[in-house]
Design a protein with these regions (language model features):
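Conserved protein kinase catalytic core
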Residues: 47, 150, 161
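Residue-level signal for well-ordered, solvent-exposed loop/turn and beta-edge residues enriched
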Residues: 94, 148-149
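Short beta->alpha transition motifs characteristic of CBS
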Residues: 43, 152-158
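Acidic/polar residues at beta-strand termini and the immediately following turn/coil
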Residues: 90-91, 144, 160, 181
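Small/polar-residue-rich segments within soluble enzyme cores
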Residues: 1-107
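A short, glycine/Asx- and small/polar-enriched loop/turn
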Residues: 33-34, 145-147
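Glycine- (often His-adjacent) and acidic-residue-rich active-site loop
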Residues: 158-165
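Active-site loop and adjoining helix of the penicillin-binding protein/serine DD-peptidase-beta-lactamase fold
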Residues: 102-146, 153, 165-206
C-alpha cells in the first residue's frame, strides 16, 4: 500500500504481522506553490526517449529524474547515488537484520538568483494587467542591471506543482498551455532597439 495511513503503520509496528514491513521513501515538496512552477520544473520517471541516455550514465530504469525546468537542467548535480542494502528475513517473512553494503549519497544543493518575493510581486502585477486586457497569457522577466542575474522569470498562466504531481494530464490539457514557459520558450518581435541604448546610457550615468 502506498501513502499508508498512520493507523495502518501503527498496526504493522505494534502487531508485526508476518510478511509485512514498512518502507520509507522521500518525496519532493513544493513551497511558494505556483509562483515559479515552469522555472523550477518537475521530476518523474525516465521516458522511453531518454532511457538509453540515462542507462549510459548508470541510472536504473526506475530512477526519478528531472523532466523540465531547473530540475532537468541541473539533474547531474541534484541527483545523488543509490546505495545497496542486505536485508535478512526469518522463515515467517519478518526482517531480522539490515546492513548497508554501499551508502547512498544525497545530491548537491543549488541556489538560483531568483528573488521569490519579487517574483510574487510580479505575479500579482501581471495577473492584474492580464485581467485588465482580458487575457490569460503573458510573461515577465527582470534582470539585475549590475550583474545580469535573473531576479524574475514568470510565465502565465501558472499552475500548482503539488497538483501536477498527481494529475499532470489535466495540467497539460489546461487552456492556455500552463506547462509552457513563455519567458524562455516564446518567440516575440523585438521592441525599439534605441530605447535599450538610451536606457543603458541612463543606467551608466546613474
Amino acid at each position: 500500500s502506498e501513502n499508508a495511513p498512520m493507523s495502518m503503520i501503527a498496526y504493522v509496528i505494534s502487531d508485526r504481522p508476518a510478511g509485512l514491513s514498512i518502507e520509507k521513501r522521500s518525496e519532493r515538496v513544493y513551497y511558494d506553490d505556483g509562483a515559479a512552477a515552469q522555472l523550477l520544473g518537475h521530476i518523474g520517471r525516465i521516458s522511453d526517449a531518454s532511457l538509453q541516455y540515462y542507462s549510459d550514465l548508470g541510472y536504473p530504469m526506475d530512477a526519478i529524474v528531472g523532466t523540465s525546468g531547473a530540475e532537468a537542467i541541473f539533474e547531474e548535480y541534484l541527483h545523488g547515488t543509490d546505495g545497496s542494502m542486505r536485508v535478512t528475513y526469518d522463515g515467517a517473512g519478518n526482517v531480522t537484520s539490515t546492513e548497508y553494503l554501499t551508502e547512498p549519497t544525497r545530491g548537491a544543493d543549488i541556489y538560483l538568483t531568483l528573488d521569490i518575493g519579487l517574483q510574487k510581486t510580479a505575479l500579482e502585477a501581471l495577473n492584474a494587467q492580464l485581467e485588465a486586457v482580458g487575457s490569460q497569457c503573458g510573461a515577465t522577466v527582470a534582470l539585475d542591471p549590475a550583474s545580469g542575474e535573473v531576479l524574475v522569470c514568470l510565465s502565465m498562466p501558472t499552475y500548482s506543482q503539488e497538483q501536477y504531481k498527481n494529475d499532470w494530464q489535466t495540467r497539460a490539457a489546461t487552456e492556455g498551455a500552463p506547462l509552457c514557459n513563455r519567458a524562455t520558450e516564446g518567440s516575440y518581435a523585438p521592441g525599439s532597439i534605441m530605447k535599450l541604448a538610451t536606457a543603458v546610457a541612463a543606467l551608466e550615468e546613474g
